[in-house]
Each structure stands twice: as structure tokens, then as C-alpha cells.
Amino acid sequence: MEAAQTIAPEWRPIPLHGRQLAYAARSDTGRVRSSNEDSLELDLETGLMVLADGMGGCNGGEIASAMAVNIVAGEFRQFPLTLPPDEVSAGLSSAAMRLCTAIAKANREIYQQGLIQPQLSGMGTTLVAALFVGARVTIASIGDSRVYRLRQGHFEQLTVDHTVVQEQVEYGLITPEQARLAGNRGLITRALGVEAGVEVDVQEQPMLPGDVFLLCSDGLFDMLDDTEIQFVIDHAGGDLETAAQHLIEAANYKGGYDNISVILARAA
């Protein structure tokens, strides 16, 4: 089993009209898989956090997820998002557009790599990204990795899973409780790099002091329900690194059937 990857928490400025952000990240292979196909990228200079959960044979999952986070983060490092202080609204809209453009580039390059190398054909990845800009966070999602927010005791899933069972829930065919136990709950309807184009869900959320954002792969929430995840965060004494470590440990204790990755960020 590979050792868990850890990024220590610290305070860093968020770009543009900035606040401060504490963060921690951790990724673990789990107790069953032989390799880790999840990838993480945090760039506190640009305010971007990205998490991807790859899929595909011949190491295709590892390649796809690594390409996704590197390309998206690289776009913001190469072309930093800069706007005058009096253009906050325009900046948020531009942030969302920039994020979509970067994700579209990642999709194209992963897809093209699959065409060039037949053994990687069909590889793809989920992706969730959070771009912190001033008093707002722009969130993008594809697949079944998730973004949650903990605000004043209320723990809420902000993203919608792109899965067959989620569609069944929306059509009233099954309940959310049944969806959690469904054998096909990991069957996704949307992924990055599988087709020449991809639809990305994008939203912009206000950020309040004390808000905690969690980006995670399905290796976490397939093992722990939302109540258990919140319990771990609440009982970490405000220490994000402790919370990240305990989330990984709890998911492994419950079975650790998949790779487990988490990014936690708290606004000051």
C-alpha cells in the first residue's frame, strides 16, 4: 500500500480582494487498491484547488487524473487572474469562464492522448475544482467527486453527482438512502477526457468567515455518510490536518475499498 500523501495546513492569502485561507490535503490508496488513481493540486498563489479521480486500464486512470489537475492548475499559473479592485462582479464571472476554459483544455488533451496511445483509449477522470477569489468561491464539477460546505453547523453537498443513481433519484425512481446502497452507484454519466467535449457544472458561492469547504473523491463518501463526515470535521478541534487525517482513517476503518482523497479549506 502506498503511503498517504499529506499537505500540511497553513495560512495563505487568497488572490484578489483577499482573505486568508487555511488548508490541508491528504490522499491515500486505501486498503484494497494496489495503486492510487486520485490526484490533487493546490496552488495558493492563484487560489485554486483541484481534485481528480481517474479511471481506465493500463494506468490510464492515474495518467488522466494527473493530466487533469496539472493542466487546470497550470493554466492559472501561466496566466494569473488579475482584475482591478472595483471589478469584483466582473472578476467572479471571469474567474468562472477561466476555470471552464482550463477544464476544456484538460478534456481535449486527455482525449487526444487516448487517441494517440490506443492502450489508454477510454481513459478519463472526474474533477472538482474550487477557485477562491476574494469573498467568493467558484466551483466546477464533472463526475462523482464532490464539494461540500460546512457553515455554522450546517453541512451541505454543493455539487451534484453525475451518476446513473443520481438520475434515478431525481426521477423519483429510488430514494437517496437506496442510492447509497445501490450496486451501480459508481457508474458515472459524465467524465473528463472520454469524449471530445464535456459539460461542466459551474457555480459561484459567497464565502463567509469560518466556512469550511471539502473536496473529496468517492472513496470517502462511499465509506462515510454525510453525518459521519461532519462529525469527524466537527471533532477535529478546528485543526484541518487532523480532520483530513481522521477522515482518511475513518474511511479505511469502514473498508477503504477505493482510493481516498480530501482537500479541506477554511476561510478566515
Predicted regions and their residues:
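PP2C/PPM-type serine/threonine phosphatase catalytic domain
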Residues: M1-A268
